Amino acid sequence: MEQRKCYFCGQMLEPGTGKLYIKKDGSTYFMCSSKCMSNFALGRLPRRTEWTEKGKIQLKKA
């Protein structure tokens, strides 16, 4: 089975877990939790959120 990565926080997802968000244009996003889903829906950027993988990298540079 294929492992997927959470679109928002970057955490690896086990097969059969997580949530799938599909936009009207057909693009799909895999989320690991409702925390990631709600932050994505609110329009927050992963690079500005401290607890995400992208945020940790971005904030180290600053």
From Swiss-Prot:
Pfam families: Ribosomal_L24e. Coiled coil: none annotated. PROSITE patterns: RIBOSOMAL_L24E (PS01073). Zn(2+) binds at C6, C9, C32, C36. Binds 1 zinc ion per subunit. GO terms for molecular function: rRNA binding; structural constituent of ribosome; zinc ion binding. One of its GO terms (cellular component) is ribosome. Its cofactor is Zn(2+). InterPro entries: L24e/L24_sf, Ribosomal_eL24-rel_arc, Ribosomal_eL24-rel_N, Ribosomal_eL24_CS, TRASH_dom. A zinc finger (C4-type) spans 6-36. GO terms for biological process: translation. Keywords: Metal-binding, Ribonucleoprotein, Ribosomal protein, RNA-binding, rRNA-binding, Zinc, Zinc-finger. Binds to the 23S rRNA. Part of the 50S ribosomal subunit. Forms a cluster with proteins L3 and L14. HAMAP family: Ribosomal_eL24 (MF_00773). Belongs to the eukaryotic ribosomal protein eL24 family. This is Large ribosomal subunit protein eL24. It comes from Methanosarcina mazei (strain ATCC BAA-159 / DSM 3647 / Goe1 / Go1 / JCM 11833 / OCM 88) (Methanosarcina frisia).
